[in-house]
């Protein structure tokens, strides 16, 4: 099989030829050729008009170069009249003017050789190239690119967004900082270079469940430079903060799903510090990590051709009249036809006396639970100590506060912030994700309403952080645990964020997430004194994810 791939979502005009006897796996006979002509603005960031002009000039050239590459290679059954089996192109997400040029070129080549057309989601291609080349079965994927940052996991025929940026993409955030200090695009490599000579400078650390935000970090970083902090120190602080956030949410996704494989995608993934952090985190929790080589991390047509081959083999092609582009094409909108419905990132099984959570080790000792936030070697020591100490104190405080407000939580028996250690009463038989039901999820909605009315949030109300079960009449009892990301707030938006995190965790772990979420929301409305304001904020939050 030989597939021509065409990429041009923003800055990289790229074409590729992917040859393989089996698109489902890596073979010794695989061959990938990539030709790329990257747009580089004279100053500032990417300008859509200039980028489109570049695509108009460069796409025909890189496509012809890729087609010429097929000449001299083995034809199909001795017939060289059509040197490719299909044309795959990036339908989105991306800049509309650039995408239209790519789509036009793809249609022209498909008609020229009378071969099928395959429309590929750019972000899913970032994921699939890592899954393909790693040989992993069903990994969690961190996509860290210019306009995007999200955590994906496969379940029930689609890639589910387990977490994502709530404002700007990670690469764009870094570029905004570098433009502020007069550095040219792209800014990421320059930040990486200067960070090597810098000392850690503290910046805001924003993780909410498995979502994250970068705008506050960038504002603080720009202000720090303006205030005279050495730029090398600010760059070091940016790397240590942003990449620790991405690594933490990746670990939270592994913990939520029980997966033991992680792949990295996206151009920001070329950063060596980020790769080391992710590798250390996975090693610490005995998971496998894979980062493709750089030519497959940055925007490239090779990943488009590889995913195109999988889709073509599954019969997932489109007619030319249906091949319109979608500049807001979210990865969770893609019907994943090339994977079996029985596959899932969901492999979690509870068992044993010790459990590795997202940021702590939990040991069961009779009627006690001993939770220790062990040091995370991937984080800068100063940042790591601050987070572990703050979260230990906050968890103990809010667990007791929730209990005083009528929410079932375990008794706190001992706290040692210096050792990041808490001893709790043991509650429940298993996690909610192992015993999902409408009634139990409705209880979670009810408990969240009570703590919100009391003036604080849970911070991470996933199906891993609710214990269920008990003896006799308490068999359906639900108990909230792990308030480490919680904080005091009266803001409706902060309360809505709890509901958003719950919704994401249900999407990643439940077979019928919509029904379960409705049960939680109905119970919340009944219990809360401020439901209207909270749900208005929730609508706003859900419109902020990339390409909503």
Swiss-Prot record:
The EC number(s) this enzyme carries:
2.3.1.234, 2.7.11.1
Write down any Gene Ontology CC term: cytoplasm
Report domain Protein kinase positions: 349-548
Query: What top-level class of enzyme does the UniProt entry assign?
Result: transferase
In this chain, ATP is annotated as bound at: 355-362, 371
- GO function term, MF aspect, one: protein serine/threonine kinase activity
Question: Which pairs are disulfide-linked?
Answer: none
Provide the binding site for Fe cation: 122, 126, 299
Primary location recorded for the protein, binned into one broad class: cytoplasm
Asked if the record carries the keyword Glycoprotein, the reply is no
Q: Where in the cell is it found?
A: Cytoplasm
Does Ion transport show up as a keyword for this record?
no
Q: Which cofactor does it need?
A: Fe(2+)
**Compositional bias segments (type: Basic and acidic residues):** 390-404
Q: What does this protein do?
A: Required for the formation of a threonylcarbamoyl group on adenosine at position 37 (t(6)A37) in tRNAs that read codons beginning with adenine. Is a component of the KEOPS complex that is probably involved in the transfer of the threonylcarbamoyl moiety of threonylcarbamoyl-AMP (TC-AMP) to the N6 group of A37. The Kae1 domain likely plays a direct catalytic role in this reaction. The Bud32 domain probably displays kinase activity that regulates Kae1 function.
What PANTHER family has UniProt attached to this entry? TRNA N6-ADENOSINE THREONYLCARBAMOYLTRANSFERASE
Self-association and partners: Component of the KEOPS complex that consists of Kae1, Bud32, Cgi121 and Pcc1; the whole complex dimerizes.
Q: What is this protein called?
A: Probable bifunctional tRNA threonylcarbamoyladenosine biosynthesis protein
Origin organism of this chain?
A: Haloarcula marismortui (strain ATCC 43049 / DSM 3752 / JCM 8966 / VKM B-1809)
């Amino acid at each position: 099989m030989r597939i021509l791939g065409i990429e041009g979502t923003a800055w990289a005009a790229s074409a590729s030829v992917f040859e393989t006897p089996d698109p489902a796996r890596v073979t010794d006979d695989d061959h990938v050729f990539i030709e790329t002509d990257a747009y580089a603005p004279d100053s500032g960031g990417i300008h859509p008009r200039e980028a489109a002009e570049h695509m108009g000039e460069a796409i025909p050239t890189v496509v012809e170069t890729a087609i010429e590459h097929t000449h001299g290679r083995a034809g199909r059954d001795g017939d060289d009249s059509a040197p490719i089996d299909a044309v795959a192109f990036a339908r989105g997400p991306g800049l509309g003017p650039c995408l239209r040029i790519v789509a036009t070129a793809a249609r022209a080549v498909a008609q020229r050789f009378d071969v099928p057309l395959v429309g590929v989601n750019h972000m899913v291609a970032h994921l699939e190239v890592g899954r393909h080349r790693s040989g992993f079965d069903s990994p969690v994927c961190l996509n860290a690119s210019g306009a995007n940052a999200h955590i994906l996991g496969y379940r029930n025929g689609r890639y589910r967004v387990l977490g994502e940026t709530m404002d700007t993409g990670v690469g764009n955030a870094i570029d905004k900082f570098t433009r502020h200090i007069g550095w040219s695009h792209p800014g990421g490599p320059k930040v990486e270079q200067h960070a090597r000579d810098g000392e850690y400078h503290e910046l805001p650390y924003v993780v909410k469940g498995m979502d994250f935000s970068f705008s506050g970090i960038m504002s603080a970083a720009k202000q720090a430079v303006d205030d005279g902090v050495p730029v090398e120190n600010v760059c070091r602080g940016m790397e240590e903060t942003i990449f620790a956030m991405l690594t933490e949410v990746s670990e939270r996704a592994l913990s939520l799903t029980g997966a033991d494989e992680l792949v990295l995608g996206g151009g920001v993934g070329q950063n060596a510090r980020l790769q080391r952090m992710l590798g250390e985190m996975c090693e610490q929790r005995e998971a496998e990590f894979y980062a493709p080589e750089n030519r497959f991390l940055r925007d490239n047509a090779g990943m488009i051709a590889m995913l195109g081959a999988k889709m073509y083999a599954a019969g997932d092609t489109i007619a030319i009249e249906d091949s319109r582009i979608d500049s807001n094409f979210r990865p969770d909108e893609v019907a994943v036809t090339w994977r079996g419905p029985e596959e899932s990132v969901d492999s979690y099984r509870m068992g044993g006396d010790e459990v590795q959570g997202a940021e702590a080790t939990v040991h069961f000792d009779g009627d006690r639970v001993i939770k220790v936030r062990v040091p995370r070697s991937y984080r800068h020591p100063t940042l790591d100590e601050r987070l572990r100490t703050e979260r230990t104190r906050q968890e103990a405080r809010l667990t007791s506060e929730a209990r005083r407000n009528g929410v079932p939580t375990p008794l706190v028996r001992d706290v040692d912030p210096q050792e990041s250690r808490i001893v709790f009463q043991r509650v429940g038989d298993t996690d909610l994700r192992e015993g999902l039901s409408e009634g139990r999820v409705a209880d979670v909605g009810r408990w969240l309403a009570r703590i919100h009315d009391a003036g604080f949030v849970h911070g991470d109300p996933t199906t891993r952080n609710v214990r269920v079960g008990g003896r006799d009449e308490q068999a359906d009892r639900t108990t909230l645990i792990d308030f480490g990301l919680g904080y005091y707030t009266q803001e409706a938006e902060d309360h809505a964020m709890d509901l958003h995190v719950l919704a994401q965790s249900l999407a990643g772990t439940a077979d019928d997430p919509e029904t379960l979420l409705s049960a939680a929301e109905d119970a919340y409305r009944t219990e809360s004194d401020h439901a209207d304001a909270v749900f208005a904020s929730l609508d706003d939050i859900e419109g902020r994810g990339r390409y909503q």
